[in-house]
Regions:
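Generic structural signal for well-ordered alpha-helical scaffold segments
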Residues: 73, 77, 133, 137, ...
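Conserved Class I SAM-dependent methyltransferase catalytic core
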Residues: 133-136, 140-156
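Glycine-rich phosphate-binding loop of actin/hexokinase-like ATP-binding domains
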Residues: 153-252
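A gly/proline- and charged-residue-enriched helix-loop-helix capping module
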Residues: 114-132, 136, 174-176, 183-187
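Short beta-strand-loop/turn "lid" adjacent to the catalytic site in phosphate-handling enzymes
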Residues: 76-125, 146, 153-161
Length: 252
């Protein structure tokens, strides 16, 4: 049986979460996982946890995302990988794909350009994702990369769900609309719920954390979601206000 090894990265502005999976068809096994934290800041560190083992933490300078990914690869090579050639691919979580992507795609220069161009809509996430993609491209030029977008799952919403009550020109010119976020999470949760319930039907998946969102899913397809033009809109969250009357900041 041929097991593929896939490295999945979630790049933040000063952190990088990673998991290495053994993939056999539709079966996934976490081989190792960890975090590179405080990238570009004093006191940076990298952690690794292999299988059910203890988490091991190493403090070392991590000036850039490229250096962080290099250290992660070195840790994996020293524990669960015999060679970098064992890696079949690298996957990245990207927050904002705008209207360009309704599914995961292979990375090429045009994809990188689009992700970078959408940075104003996800300033904490998209620039970091681009740094991670470029770092992998430099370190592992022959390994294919795939990006999965938080917005992709919500691209099935109809205009009555995603359009704001603004002049149509604002949408046509600036693409101002509801995009949603946490789509990968909503897709997974709605699928798992459907399995447990025994039918797809109507499901309300909730993603609750420092960022939080709720979606409406009918027969496996997203029909509405709480987040909007950016991940700031919607319900009250751990570190974001959610919806606030637009006059409040002007009043203050």
């Amino acid at each position: 049986i041929h097991m593929e090894k896939i490295l999945v990265l979630n790049s933040g502005s000063s952190s990088l979460k990673y998991q290495l999976f053994n993939v056999d068809g539709d079966k996934f096994e976490v081989v190792a996982k960890g975090l590179a934290d405080r990238i570009g800041i004093e006191g940076s560190l990298v952690t690794i946890k292999v299988g059910d083992g203890d988490k091991v933490t190493t403090e070392l300078p991590l000036p850039t995302h490229k250096e962080a990914i290099k250290e992660v690869l070195d840790l994996l090579l020293g524990s669960v990988l015999k060679s970098i050639d064992e890696l079949s691919g690298v996957g990245h979580r990207v927050v904002h794909g705008g209207e360009y992507f309704d599914r995961s795609v292979l990375v090429d220069d045009e994809v990188i350009r689009i992700i970078d161009g959408l940075s104003t809509l996800a300033p904490l996430h998209n620039p970091a994702a681009v740094m991670g993609i470029k770092a992998v491209k430099a370190l592992l030029p022959n390994v294919p990369q795939v990006v999965a977008f938080d917005t992709a799952f919500h691209q099935t919403m109809k205009p009555e769900a995603y359009m704001y009550a603004l002049p149509l020109e604002q949408y046509k010119k600036y693409k101002i609309r509801r995009y949603g976020a946490h789509g990968t999470s909503h897709l997974f949760v709605s699928r798992e719920a459907a399995k447990l319930i025994g039918k797809a039907g109507k499901i309300i998946p909730c993603h609750i954390g420092n960022g939080a969102s709720i979606s409406a899913v009918k027969d496996g397809v997203c029909v509405d979601t709480s987040m909007g033009f950016t991940p700031l809109a919607g319900v009250v969250m751990g570190t974001r206000s959610g919806d606030v009357d637009p006059f409040v900041p002007l009043y203050i």
